[in-house]
Structure formats: structure tokens, C-alpha cells
Curated annotation (Swiss-Prot):
Gene encoding the protein: xerS
Gene Ontology biological-process entries: cell division; chromosome segregation; DNA recombination
Name of the protein described by the UniProt record: Tyrosine recombinase XerS
Family recorded in the similarity comment: Belongs to the 'phage' integrase family. XerS subfamily.
HAMAP family the record matches: Recomb_XerS
Chief place where the protein resides: cytoplasm
Length: 356
């Protein structure tokens, strides 16, 4: 989603929120939480407070008038009723069942509410230096996490990774084979952004950065000589990330046409651009997701940019057998989250043995 549109939607939600949610928003913006994260949280609060009004828990006329005391006095039974409401209400997102939304969606909603309650009961200070209230009902609410072993996750993920020669094979396919099947009109559209698309996908495959980190890159963040990019990690931390050498020609080809193709001026600092009505703009995450899905589905299997991150991590672990190195490359504080890649690589080793 483009930043301008995102901020417009955030402003619309802020206009209907209670004052204490607006204080929460300002506090988290200072952390800083990303605008995308805060937008998702505001949507969850909109859903929750709409239910508060519909269920009669508050007799306020509108959402912004719901008093803080409603949250303070919310019972465990009330919150469980809200969870049941979510389970039985379909169409909250694409991952619905006949019975209602997925457990993942419910957990996301509860996570947003837990963050708000923690702020109100622990983090904020009133004039006396105390939180607004102390009773945190969210600590009494249990969440059900999806049960899946690392081996099961590895089995599910590995079919959607471009390992071995498939990494550069994917890039070669986009460059040489994909355009051969296009109509003249589609080919013209493809050629307009070919270098950019290849540069983005190559960078994701060669660095393992998150999609948000890639689209937020500025020109100054790329050091082609050293093959290093400076990114803003989760929580606003800056980090320098090494990029594999195979991405260099794709990045060079894009930079060679960037200014002329996208009609840039000095104010256009974003690394990856798109043209809208002749005006260059930073490419948004949604556009990259659609682009990766289109090319990957035609090549092998439809994947998300996050699977390209998994691809890099798996290849790096396979080459180094170092979880520490992989965790540093991905920007993780611990090696626990990299355990998944050991299972994927073990499966690859087993397949190699079976072929002997």
C-alpha cells in the first residue's frame, strides 16, 4: 500500500477512536512502530469497539465516546464472548471457514488488544505517575497457537523454495523465457519494468531482507562496490546487510535505466520506483507481492516475497552450517528462529543420499 493511502486510512480510523487509543498510537509511533503495524492495530480496535457497542457493553453513542472504564471493567467472560463472536463471524479475511475466521486472525486481534491493555495498565503514566488502571483482563485470556513441529513446517515450506540452481534459474527464466510467451501488448508492459522487477527479486534472493525493508530502501542505502545495503529493521533499528554477488548485475542494469525510465528528479530518493500518471513514486509492498506471485507461479509455484527470504536463509545455512551467521543475516536477535532451516537442509541431505 502506498504511504499516502496508508496515512489517509490511518487518519480516518484515528477520527473515530477513543482518546486513550490515540494516546497509545502516539506512544507507539515514538518507539517507533511502523505505520503498517499501527494501521493493522487500529483496524483491530475498530473491530473490537464496534462489538463493544453492538453487544451493549457500553451505551456510548459512538466509538470515540467509549469511556476508559469499559476496558477497566471488562470481564474475562466479556472477552471470551468477543472471541466467540469472532469465531462465528465469517468474512473478516480470506482465511475463513464455514464457522468463522481462522485462529491466526483471532490471535492477531488478541495480540493487538494485549498491546493496548499493556500500555494502559503498565506503560502510560497519569499526573500521579501511575497507569490509568491496573487490571489487565488480557492476561486471563488464553490463545490457541497452531500446533506444528519444525519438521512439519520444513516439509510444507521446502516445496516453495528456490534452492540450488533454481535461485538463479528463476531470475534467468524471468529475463529470457517469461517474455517469450507474452503478447505484444503484454511484452511492452513487461519491458517497462523488467530491469526493476529483476533487481528487486535478485535483491530479495541475495540478501534475505524483509519485503518492507526492501521497498523502503533509498538510493543512498545501496553500496554496489561493497555489495551492502543499509536497512531499517523491525523496531526501527538500522542494520547493514551483505548482498550475494549474483545480484550485482541485476542491480547495475536497473540503476542504468532508473533515472530516464522513471523520470526522476533529485527529490526521488527511493531506490525502487514505479510510474503513476507520469510521476515517479516509491514502489509499495503490494505491488512487489503481486509481481513475485506472477513470476513465481509461471516458473514453478506461486510464492510470497517471504519465501524468497526463506530461500536465502536455507541456502546460507546449507553452505555454512552456521545458525549464528544466518540469524545475523536475517536480523534476528537469537538463533531459535533459524532452527527451521536446519530441518529443511537435513531433508535436502536425505534426498541426496536417497539418490545415490
Amino acid at each position: 500500500m502506498k504511504r499516502e493511502i496508508l496515512l489517509e486510512r490511518i487518519d480516518k480510523l484515528k477520527q473515530i477512536m477513543p482518546w486513550y487509543v490515540l494516546e497509545y498510537y502516539q506512544s507507539k509511533l515514538a518507539v517507533p512502530y511502523s505505520f503498517t503495524t499501527l494501521y493493522e492495530y487500529l483496524k483491530e480496535y475498530d473491530r473490537f469497539f464496534s462489538w463493544v457497542l453492538e453487544s451493549g457493553i457500553s451505551n456510548a453513542d459512538k466509538m470515540s465516546d467509549i469511556p476508559l472504564s469499559v476496558l477497566e471493567n471488562m470481564s474475562k467472560k466479556d472477552m471470551e464472548s468477543f472471541i466467540l463472536y469472532l469465531r462465528e463471524r465469517p468474512l473478516l479475511n480470506a482465511n475463513t471457514t464455514k464457522q468463522g475466521v481462522s485462529q491466526t486472525t483471532i490471535n492477531r486481534t488478541l495480540s493487538a488488544l494485549s498491546s493496548l491493555y499493556k500500555y494502559l495498565t503498565e506503560e502510560v503514566e497519569n499526573d500521579q505517575g501511575e497507569p490509568y488502571f491496573y487490571r489487565n483482563v488480557m492476561k486471563k485470556v488464553s490463545t490457541k497457537k497452531k500446533k506444528e513441529t519444525l519438521a512439519a513446517r520444513a516439509e510444507n515450506i521446502k516445496q516453495k523454495l528456490f534452492l540450488g540452481d533454481e535461485t538463479e534459474g528463476f531470475l534467468t527464466y524471468i529475463d529470457q523465457e517469461y517474455p517469450q510467451q507474452l503478447s505484444n501488448r503484454a511484452l511492452s508492459s513487461f519491458n517497462k519494468n523488467k530491469e526493476r522487477d529483476l533487481a528487486i527479486i535478485a535483491l530479495l534472493l541475495a540478501s534475505g531482507v524483509r519485503l518492507s525493508e526492501a521497498v523502503n530502501l533509498d538510493l543512498r542505502d545501496l553500496n554496489l562496490k561493497m555489495m551492502v545495503i543499509d536497512v531499517t529493521r523491525k523496531g526501527g533499528k538500522r542494520d547493514s546487510v551483505n548482498v550475494a554477488a549474483f545480484a550485482k548485475p541485476y542491480l547495475e542494469n536497473y540503476l542504468a535505466i532508473r533515472n530516464q525510465r522513471y523520470k526522476t528528479e533529485k527529490i526521488d530518493t527511493a531506490l525502487f520506483l514505479t510510474l503513476y500518471r507520469g510521476v515517479p513514486n516509491r514502489i509499495d509492498a503490494s505491488s512487489v507481492e503481486k509481481m513475485v506471485a506472477k513470476y513465481s507461479e509461471d516458473f514453478k509455484v506461486r510464492v510470497t516475497p517471504h519465501k524468497l527470504r526463506h530461500t536465502l536463509a536455507t541456502r546460507l545455512y546449507d553452505a555454512t552450517k552456521s545458525q549464528v551467521l544466518v540469524s545475523h543475516q536475517l536480523g534476528h536477535a537469537s538463533t531459535q528462529v533459524t532452527d527451521l532451516y536446519t530441518h529443511i537442509v537435513n531433508d535436502e541431505q536425505k534426498n541426496a543420499l536417497d539418490s545415490l
